From Swiss-Prot:
NCBIfam families: greA, PRK00226.1-2, PRK00226.1-4, PRK00226.1-5. GO terms for biological process: DNA-templated transcription elongation; regulation of DNA-templated transcription elongation. It comes from Bartonella quintana (strain Toulouse). It comes from the Bacteria. Necessary for efficient RNA polymerase transcription elongation past template-encoded arresting sites. The arresting sites in DNA have the property of trapping a certain fraction of elongating RNA polymerases that pass through, resulting in locked ternary complexes. Cleavage of the nascent transcript by cleavage factors such as GreA or GreB allows the resumption of elongation from the new 3'terminus. GreA releases sequences of 2 to 3 nucleotides. One of its GO terms (molecular function) is RNA polymerase binding. Belongs to the GreA/GreB family. PROSITE patterns: GREAB_1, GREAB_2. This is Transcription elongation factor GreA. It holds the Pfam family GreA_GreB.
Length: 157
């Protein structure tokens, strides 16, 4: 079974979602199915079919979360240090083309959310950053074209 790197915060977030899906969402869906059944003919009962679809999605997500949690290699980022960029690093970059500054943290695939500055360890920009250090310049080939970034700061927070 292949281990999946994950920050402590990401691991706790997955456990929280799993608890919610098992303890709150599952009973709510079961109740919705029961109520829809009470309306009679199931072949044309849209509420019943919607509830069954929600149940299928929820159970699939529960299985997925259980798998991620079982395979998690939890890494406490605050205990990491060093000059070189690795999993868990928070990096401040300067886009040399636009002069725009960006801050990213390299996290596991399941935690990635570009809107909040969390990029997947398997993303093109993270792969370009791994092993680099402050002052280095990287080139990232993105869908919108190549970008050059200068690494301004590396932290483990």
């Amino acid at each position: 079974m292949e281990k999946v790197p994950m920050t402590t915060a990401g691991f706790e977030s997955l456990k929280k979602e799993l608890r919610w899906r098992q303890q709150e969402e599952r009973p709510r869906i079961i109740e919705a199915i029961s109520e829809a059944r009470a309306h009679g003919d199931l072949s044309e009962n849209a509420e019943y079919h919607a509830a069954k679809e929600a149940q299928s999605y929820n159970e699939g997500r529960i299985n997925e979360l259980e798998d991620y949690i079982a395979r998690a290699e939890v890494i406490n980022v605050s205990r990491l240090s060093g000059d070189k960029i690795k999993f868990g690093a928070t990096i401040k970059l300067l886009d040399e083309d636009t002069e725009e500054k960006k801050v990213y943290q390299i996290v596991g695939d399941q935690e990635a959310d570009v809107k909040t500055g969390k990029i997947s360890i398997s993303s093109p920009i993270a792969r370009a950053l791994i092993g680099k250090q402050e002052g280095d310049v990287i080139e990232v080939n993105a869908p919108g074209g190549a970008h050059n970034y200068e690494i301004i700061k590396v932290q483990y927070i």
